[in-house]
């Protein structure tokens, strides 16, 4: 990912060939800040929701696309099953199966989604929301994966998949992933800033247009507001 001097995302660079060798030191990652692993989980979780909405809209699916779809589902399933165990390993500083599963999922399985799926297995709505948020200076302290995790929920609102949002909320709460602008300390963003974010998320080059339907700034703005209202009601209900 390339950013400008102000911290706004400019573009993704996709290389013609992949790494010849990748070495992973699980013990080194075990000793890293936990919030980085949580952000990595949020980013990898998007693999399923972005690949799924794109691949399901294809009239036919080649074998490599089917592999990408399978790997994307494995990302979601592994993250939902093993994240709690992995974070416990970091707290105790003791390797366990769940930690290794999460590391392999974030790096290896996640890489397979885009590796086999190419444009159909990389980004859709969630990453467009991330990209747009980077233009706001107030977001620059937030980790990439946290903004992407928020973007997943905005994408699901656009898809009108509130049932899936409800499924994810306990997981988000457990890991501390943001469920709203409020959770990211952005509740006071001005209306004109939200409008600018929505316009940026739907620029012609953005991957949100890989989703079926017409993706306009109004669609994104309304989804962000609906999500914010829903999460505010849940906070009041507590």
Regions found by a protein language model. Name each.
Residues 15-16, 116-118, 206-207:
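Short hydrophobic "helix-edge" motifs at membrane interfaces and signal-peptide entry regions
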Residues 48, 52-56, 86, 109, ...:
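A short secondary-structure junction motif
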Residues 61-174:
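Active-site segments that bind and position negatively charged phosphate/pyrophosphate groups
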Residues 161-238:
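C-terminal charged capping/lid subdomain of soluble metabolic enzymes
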């Amino acid at each position: 990912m390339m950013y400008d001097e102000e911290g706004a995302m400019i573009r993704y660079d996709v290389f013609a060939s992949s790494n010849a060798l990748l070495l992973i030191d699980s013990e080194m990652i075990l000793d890293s800040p936990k919030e980085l692993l949580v952000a990595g989980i949020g980013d990898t979780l998007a693999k399923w929701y972005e690949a799924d909405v794109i691949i399901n809209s294809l009239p036919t699916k080649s074998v490599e696309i089917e592999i990408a779809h399978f790997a994307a589902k494995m990302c979601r399933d592994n993250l939902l099953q093993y994240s709690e165990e992995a974070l416990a390993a970091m707290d105790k500083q003791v390797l366990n199966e769940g930690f290794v599963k999460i590391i392999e999922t974030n790096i290896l399985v996640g890489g397979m989604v885009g590796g086999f799926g190419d444009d159909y297995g990389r980004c859709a709505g969630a990453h467009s929301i991330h990209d747009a948020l980077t233009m706001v200076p107030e977001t620059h302290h937030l980790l990439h994966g946290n903004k992407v995790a928020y973007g997943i929920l905005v994408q699901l609102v656009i898809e009108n998949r509130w049932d899936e949002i409800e499924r994810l909320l306990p997981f988000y709460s457990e890991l501390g992933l943001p469920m709203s602008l409020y959770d990211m300390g952005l509740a006071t963003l001005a209306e004109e800033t939200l409008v600018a974010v929505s316009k940026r998320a739907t620029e012609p080059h953005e991957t949100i247009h890989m989703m079926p339907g017409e993706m306009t700034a109004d669609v994104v703005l309304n989804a962000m507001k609906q999500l914010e209202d829903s999460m505010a009601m849940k906070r009041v209900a507590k």
